[in-house]
Amino acid sequence: KLLEGTFWEKQEYHNISESTMRSLLRRYSGTQAVSNFRPTAAALMYDKFLEKASPLFGTKAGTTWDMSCGYGGRLLGAIAADVNYIGTDPCTETFEGLKQIKEDWAGLNRTIELHQVGSEEFWPDKNSIDLCFTSPPYFDWEKYSEEETQSYKKYPEVQDWIDGFLWHTIDKCHYGLKIGGILALNVANTKRIKNFEEVTVRIAKEIAYKHIDTWKLQLSSQTGTP
């Protein structure tokens, strides 16, 4: 399935250990994280846009904010790429899984910071983030739970969701990003929001982002299509 990744500025690739990635995939292949967003694809994004810690060159690991963690695919990618990760997600069940991943794989060279809250309510530290990267929920297409904290429950109408969830999430990314930082959103038009891609770009420009590029990202197939 092709999804559009929309980006708002680039770097060198870091060689990901194949044995490490295989270990991660074996450990968590029973969850939806691997099929929902491949850790390998996430790791490549981090390799492209984030610095790596290097005592030799005096660089520190970059920081990414995953605004909608889901089942942890991007978290696993951040672990493999050895970068700092901030994650937000309101779903109780998936959040427990994210905490288990952190417990199993947290290392000395990276920080993993998890918050059980919707991204539209989370205030990151100002100018502290290098990359904001996620696949936002497609309104009520992705229902991780029936909890009232879910964005489709809090904002039950499409326009309310766009104004209340999507706009405020993109705005808080702008607050947290460093100058020259990147916002990368994996979005696609859906039956419920037929112009989702256009709306996302419009909101970002209104908030003062500069639209740099749009990529086509090949993801593993999922049940149904948005």
Predicted regions and their residues:
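Class I S-adenosyl-L-methionine-dependent methyltransferase catalytic core
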Residues: 1-226
